[in-house]
């Protein structure tokens, strides 16, 4: 009996601890790899994942380089794991068409991590299902040619500050980082056009708006926290949402308060006194339901059509009242997306275009002649004259976006199990469109690393295979602000090249090193010299 008692104590003590530890380790080992059989079951090739973090280390060199490597090693349809989440990567045009257009009803939503800032989560970029459709429909009118024409003078005013700053570099003859100048300029445009708050980032870097913008784009998740989020998403993501975060809360509070104050001021003003900026266009549209259906949401298709500055007859219907008007949080969200697109996408597009023109002087000379002729006819450019009167500038921008698409990857989620061109797609799967790999595929773009604006003559574009050029996406959920983004890029290059010429110099990095943590951009800036004309 004493022996049995002794045995009982042993079982209840250290042996239980050891047994539980072994069971826990076995459970963790199973959990660490349990999500990593799904791609294989779908017949999709992929890099070998590491326990818990999946293929996170595959992307340590940057998403751009890794996207090219995925395409090279595993083909136009492959996959990877980021933590436990599975991604199906597509760079095959016909399948992309099926996802973005033909089967859009099953791929309506973008992937959301659950960690987005409140302002970002309430934007049209991340809204989902019916609410996305309602808000996108209401905002369509804010991007009409008529409304963009009203915003053109505001962009030109911000550009005047940029020109004054560039003049000092032209007078000094020094090499400088023009990307930093563009970043200050796009901050000024965003503040003025989207937030109704004119600033001068170059002269007033301590302005609260400028400081909070800088804080937002410097925000990043520490690597150990990122590993935990990827490894245990069902626990860590909800926890991260509810735990206090001073930086996040201060940024949300600042931009929310700023918009609320502007709304309160404008509600007290007569209609003719209100500033005609993007924020006002959103406020004007906040109660209006879309007069069109999802099938007419494709802004990118309109922009690249031959009638891009003419009214679309399908949209010439009177909008009715919106069942649930845009909330203040949603209005802040739209301004916030303007901030992200303006600060990153427009800045980087301008930087890349400047680099390509500086290193391709023959193309720059041709563009300068077009700019001079245009300026002779249009001293004060309007939206439609910019749309139709600068064909070579259009070609330069299009080729810049082919070579260096800032938005080089975007996602869709499968709502239900389906089959796309013979490939089974399970519900909840995240599909990633590999725009960078598509734009550098020699099958579609011969000599893809060569800058050649002639790829985008009217005749050449007729020969392009559909869905091989996607700098703004495609289909009903393509970029809503494509017109405004291109307007800002074109207007800026027009004003700058009318006054200055870009020159490569010993400090110019050739080829450019790239950074791709989020949007694609130059890693070390774009150093050039400029000469007054």
Curated annotation (Swiss-Prot):
Keywords: Endoplasmic reticulum, Fatty acid biosynthesis, Fatty acid metabolism, Heme, Iron, Isomerase, Lipid biosynthesis, Lipid metabolism, Lyase, Membrane, Metal-binding, Monooxygenase, Oxidoreductase, Prostaglandin biosynthesis, Prostaglandin metabolism, Transmembrane, Transmembrane helix. Residues 32-75, 245-335 are lumenal. Residues 1-10, 97-223, 357-533 are cytoplasmic. The chain crosses the membrane at residues 11-31, 76-96, 224-244, 336-356. Heme binds at residue 479. It catalyses: prostaglandin H2 = thromboxane A2; prostaglandin H2 = (12S)-hydroxy-(5Z,8E,10E)-heptadecatrienoate + malonaldehyde; a hydroperoxyeicosatetraenoate = an oxoeicosatetraenoate + H2O; (15S)-hydroperoxy-(5Z,8Z,11Z,13E)-eicosatetraenoate = 15-oxo-(5Z,8Z,11Z,13E)-eicosatetraenoate + H2O. Monomer. This is Thromboxane-A synthase. The lineage of its organism: Eukaryota, Metazoa, Chordata, Craniata, Vertebrata.
